[in-house]
């Protein structure tokens, strides 16, 4: 599947988010309704403020109950997330285990 992305506003901050799908075959709890994706978040000058708006804490952990995440991933249900973010100075990569909701999926 090809990458896809969209631009969203978080508290007046415009952020471009790119999704890339990764094989989930290595996950022991993988099911047909689950997929493992990588979210590449293109940094902006106010990246830290937008991170907080997304519920990404300073230690890299993600608050999955954050309403901004619910709004961003309205077509997906966040089953769990991995707090092992990698920051190379250009991108913050966040790993999610997502459960698809086919009735409302946009792709």
Curated annotation (Swiss-Prot):
Any one GO cellular component localisation term in the record: mitochondrion
Keywords of the record: Mitochondrion
Subcellular location: Mitochondrion
Protein's UniProt name: Uncharacterized mitochondrial protein AtMg00720
């Amino acid at each position: 599947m090809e990458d896809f992305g969209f631009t969203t506003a978080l508290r007046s901050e415009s952020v471009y988010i790119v999704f890339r799908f990764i094989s989930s075959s290595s996950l022991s709890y993988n099911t047909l309704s689950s997929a493992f994706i990588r979210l590449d978040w293109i940094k902006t000058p106010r990246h830290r403020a937008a991170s907080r708006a997304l519920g990404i804490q300073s230690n890299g952990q993600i608050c999955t109950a954050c309403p901004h995440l619910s709004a961003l991933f309205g077509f997906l249900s966040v089953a769990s997330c991995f707090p092992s973010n990698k920051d190379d100075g250009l991108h913050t990569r966040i790993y999610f285990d997502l459960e698809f909701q086919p009735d409302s999926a946009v792709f």
